Amino acid sequence: MSASPQSRPTTIACLLGPTASGKTAAALALAARRPIEIVSIDSALVYRDMDIGTAKPTRDERARVPHHLIDIIDPADAYSAAEFRADALRLIGEIAARGRTPLLAGGTMLYYKALTQGLNDLPTADPAVRAELDADAARDGWPALHARLAQVDPATAARLAPNDSQRIQRALEVFLLSGQPMSVLLAAPRRADDEAAAYRFVPVALEPSDRAVLHARIAQRFDAMLDAGFIDEVERLRRREDLHPDLPSMRCVGYRQAWEFLDGDTDYRTMRDKGIFATRQLCKRQITWLRALPERIVVDCVAPDATARALDTLERVLDDHLPA
């Protein structure tokens, strides 16, 4: 599916939206019409054994249409935006070679931005540096490392909470490996490549005209997860000695709140309320990211015919009936 520098870029439809916006329903509706394969743009779906809390597509749904970048790593491991970009570009080519159509679908805007805008030249993770920072944090606490970060990269430190261990560690790691603040490197021009330039990524954004409707859906979905055994799922993960609350996987919305409940730090009602609140905050951030995409095509995800509208829009994108 790659194009030569002189040819017109190949259009790739990207179905984007916040949690509970109906992405799965729209993608499955398209699969009933066309031979598509779905490439997930979701940083939570990459983890194995995290099915209920991530609202992972069911076995039946995945049997109806091939899904990619789901269940690809263990919860103890990490998966970067750079890895996503490389995997997504590879999959787009492989799907096209099979005579099928790739549909990118999800709500992790960091992944989408890396795919469509390129990458910053940040150093890759270094296990030795991370182990040293972990040891420092165990001795002095993350607020002390946050103070250390403020001395070398005040701009990054200012936007991070003193206990945001994952991001503090990464910012210090970048400085130690590169000698430059992360804020400076992130402000530099992004590195693109010819492979991504062969594609025209068209974002179809599922956005709510009434956010209260989406908030109600989020509460209903979280309650359904609890009824489906979400707490038991987290308990099984907790029993693993290699997992802890500061891992990226266990920081996913819902999992952190369930872990706190199982630790006895909160009661069930508080856990539920905090989980719903955290999901709504994630939704708010996702919508903010979407609205920063001037080229997006908006579909009202709370309209009664939202799935039909999304399907019609996706088909027009794939048929190239939209202006370039």
From Swiss-Prot:
Reported EC number(s) for this entry are 2.5.1.75
Q: Which GO terms fall under biological process for this protein?
A: tRNA modification
Q: Which residues bind substrate?
A: 19-24
Pfam families reported for this sequence: IPPT
Could you say which residues are annotated as the site Interaction with substrate tRNA? 108, 130
- Output the InterPro entries linked to this UniProt entry: Dimethylallyltransferase, IPT, P-loop_NTPase
Binding residue positions for ATP: 17-24
Q: Give any GO molecular function from the UniProt entry.
A: ATP binding
| Stored NCBIfam families | miaA
Summarize subunit and interaction data from the UniProt record for this chain. Answer: Monomer.
Q: What is this protein called?
A: tRNA dimethylallyltransferase
What organism is recorded for this protein? Burkholderia ambifaria (strain MC40-6)
Quote the gene name from the UniProt entry: miaA
